[in-house]
Amino acid sequence: MKESEIQEHIRAACNTGNTRAWRNNIAKLNVRGRWINYGIPGPGGSDLLGLHTLTVTPDHVGCRVAVFTAIECKNAGGRIRPEQQNFIDFVKKYGGIAGIARSPNEALSIINEFKPCP
C-alpha cells in the first residue's frame, strides 16, 4: 500500500469515538524568490493533527494533559468566515480552546479563561 493510502486508513480510524484527526499538508513554495513554508508547525510537522477528548479521572490528578488550541487572528475590521466559525465551534465542542482574537491580550484571554468543564 502506498503511504498516502495508509495515511487515509489511519485518519479514518482516528475519526471515531472521542478522537478527530485532519490531514496536515506541508509544503514549501517559492514566491518571488522567497520560500514560504505551509503546514503546522512547518517542516517536520506530522501528517495528521487532531484532538482527543479525555475525561479526567482521579488517576489523572497531577498529570499534564495537552489541550488543542486554535486562535483565529483578525484585525480590527476583519470578519470571520462561516467555515472559520464552524471550526472554532467544532474545537470547543470537543473540549479544545478556540476563539477569535484581534490582539495578543484577546488571545491570552481566550486561553486563560478556558474551563475544561462547563
Q: What does each model-identified segment do?
A:
Residues 1-118:
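Catalytic phosphate/metal-binding cores of nucleic-acid and nucleotide-processing enzymes, i.e., regions
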